[in-house]
Amino acid sequence: LKCKKLVPLFSKTCPPGKNLCYKMFMVAAPKVPVKRGCINVCPKSSLLVKYVCCNTDKCN
C-alpha cells in the first residue's frame, strides 16, 4: 500500500501491519490537511479533529 505524505506530490510505502491511509484535518478548516500517512487503525474523530481513512493506494 502506498499513501500520500503531507505534500501530496510525495508518497511512501506503508510498513507491514499499517494497511490504511489516513488524512487528518481540523473541523474548522476541512480543506487543509494537518497530517497524512499510514496507520493500522483509523482513529476516532472528535469535535476539533476529523480523520478520513481508506485502503487503496494514494487514496488519502
From Swiss-Prot:
Disulphide bonds in the chain: 3-21, 14-38, 42-53, 54-59
Name the UniProt record assigns to this protein: Cytotoxin SP15d
UniProt GO BP: killing of cells of another organism
Xref: PROSITE patterns: SNAKE_TOXIN
Organism superkingdom: Eukaryota
InterPro entries, sorted: Cytotoxin_Cobra, Snake_3FTx, Snake_toxin-like_sf, Snake_toxin_con_site, Toxin_cobra-type
One GO cellular component, as annotated: extracellular region
Role played: Shows cytolytic activity on many different cells by forming pore in lipid membranes. In vivo, increases heart rate or kills the animal by cardiac arrest. In addition, it binds to heparin with high affinity, interacts with Kv channel-interacting protein 1 (KCNIP1) in a calcium-independent manner, and binds to integrin alpha-V/beta-3 (ITGAV/ITGB3) with moderate affinity.
Keywords (A to Z) from UniProt: Cardiotoxin, Cytolysis, Disulfide bond, Membrane, Secreted, Target cell membrane, Target membrane, Toxin
Tissue expr: Expressed by the venom gland.
Alphabetical list of Gene3D superfamilies matching this protein: CD59
